[in-house]
Design a protein with these regions (language model features):
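N-terminal periplasmic accessory domains that precede
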Residues: 78-81, 98-101, 112-113, 131-134, ...
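Short acidic/polar hinge/loop motifs at secondary-structure boundaries
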Residues: 101, 118-148
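Face-selective signature of the C-terminal outer-membrane beta-barrel domain
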Residues: 246-260, 287-416
Length: 416
């Protein structure tokens, strides 16, 4: 065990890391006349063609953020990992919403995936799933593949500007890690903590990995003294589990499950003077932003010298509940008076992505590598953002009426 102390410009962090691994040693005999040659292998990329090929052979502009780079830069989230990427800009707009841009594009034209799988996210026309730059953590990540430029032929219109594909680790040995981080804001106040446990193992033909965390951040108060909370704060609980089986012929079957749960809030205050020195009111507004996403997948794949193929079914379910609540209290002569609690405004979203896909890649001669595949995707959304205003829902009056809509996508593609 060792202790690391890291300093940042905006906050200080104290980090404990405990790593355990199993190692296999074998005897080595050295000879004076033996000559050792070293080779640097060209990095491999999957996202550009949906099958593994070298970066040099890729038809797209590709950048890989390797595990070594992630470690050197101490990247904790996908936002951190993308800071050094060429042509990629991650920023927050005036409403605090995350945005991702590739070569100046809008966020809705950048597709973010994990292991080639889409993620259910906000029903937001502008930001799409850009919020995931802060949700996706790097403890279980092998590399991040970035495609700069249109990839609509393989991934659809939401990849018009490019693709960011997070590739997670494949268990190769028994290992694990425990991480804990506590941070402080510039003003010396506690910013909260982040904790994570990662385990992986291999037993004969079976492999597994478990990644679980608990994060709790605290509010950053307005330095001007208004009493406003400048950030959303609260708890975040991510967990993922993957189990795989490798058959004797080399084919692999894997099942994956992941869930992230967020309970966040943010408050602001305002004072309205009715009669100076005599009557005024204090208004406290609180926003509750609670999110949960659950992902399931089942994958069967295989490869040999001639071809590589995969068949996969997966589902991503995103639940959101956004509530705003106003509480007003009157003061007369400095004495507290009537408290008025308004009905909360509630916005709810449930989005379900269901996908069945498969593709096969094979060599045709010495110069051609053909990939052919198909994808069926159903994007079903329900909530308060789909109809006219005014219809009440449980707990208060919604911004919009509750309704449901679905879009079905079917794609067939061939690429050389």
């Amino acid at each position: 065990m060792w202790l690391k102390v890291r300093r940042f410009v905006k906050k200080r962090s104290l980090i404990f890391t405990l790593i355990g691994s199993s190692f296999l040693f074998s005897g080595v005999t050295a000879h004076a006349e033996e000559v050792t040659e070293s080779f640097t292998l060209d990095p491999m990329v999957i996202t550009a063609t949906r099958t593994e090929m070298s970066v040099k052979e890729s038809p797209s502009a590709v950048e890989i953020v390797s595990s070594k780079k992630l470690e050197e830069t101490q990247a904790k989230t996908l936002r951190d990992a993308l800071k050094s990427a060429l042509g990629v800009n991650v920023f927050n707009d005036f409403q605090g919403r995350s945005n991702v841009s590739i070569r100046g594009s809008e966020s809705r034209h950048v597709l973010i995936m994990v292991d080639g799988k889409r993620l259910g996210g906000e029903l937001s026309y502008n930001s799409a799933n850009a919020w995931d730059v802060d949700r996706i953590r790097m403890e279980d990540v092998e590399r991040v593949e970035i495609i700069r430029g249109p990839a609509g032929a393989l991934y659809g219109s939401d990849a018009m500007a490019g693709v960011i594909n997070v590739i997670t680790k494949t268990p190769e040995k028994n290992a694990g890690s425990i991480n804990y981080e506590y941070g402080w804001y510039e003003n010396g106040k506690g910013a909260g903590y982040k904790s994570n446990v990662y385990l992986q193992g291999v037993e004969k033909n079976v492999s597994y990995k478990l990644n679980a965390g608990l994060n709790n951040n605290r509010p950053y108060m307005d330095p001007a003294g208004s009493g406003d909370e400048m950030n959303f704060y609260g708890k975040e609980q991510p967990i993922s589990l993957s189990v795989g089986y490798k058959f004797d012929n080399g084919n692999q079957l894997s099942a994956d499950f992941s869930r992230i749960k967020e309970d966040n809030q943010k408050g602001s205050s305002s004072v309205t003077v009715m009669r100076p020195g005599e009557v005024w009111q204090n208004k406290k507004s609180t926003i509750y932003n609670d999110n949960k996403r659950t992902d399931y997948s089942l994958t069967y794949k295989g490869d040999d010298e001639k071809q590589s193929w995969i068949i996969r079914a997966y589902q991503s379910v995103y639940d959101k509940r956004y509530t705003s609540q106003d509480v007003t209290q009157m003061f007369t002569g400095g004495k507290p008076g009537t408290i008025t609690v308004k009905d909360p405004k509630i916005d709810t979203v449930k989005r379900t992505l269901s996908v069945i896909e498969g593709h096969d890649s094979w060599h045709m001669g010495d110069k051609h590598y053909l990939t052919a595949g198909l994808e069926y995707r159903r994007d079903n959304s329900e909530g308060t953002r789909l109809k006219k205003k005014g219809t009440p829902v449980a707990g208060g009056s919604a911004y919009n009426a509750y309704d449901e809509a679905a879009i079905n996508y079917t794609a067939v593609y061939v690429q050389d």
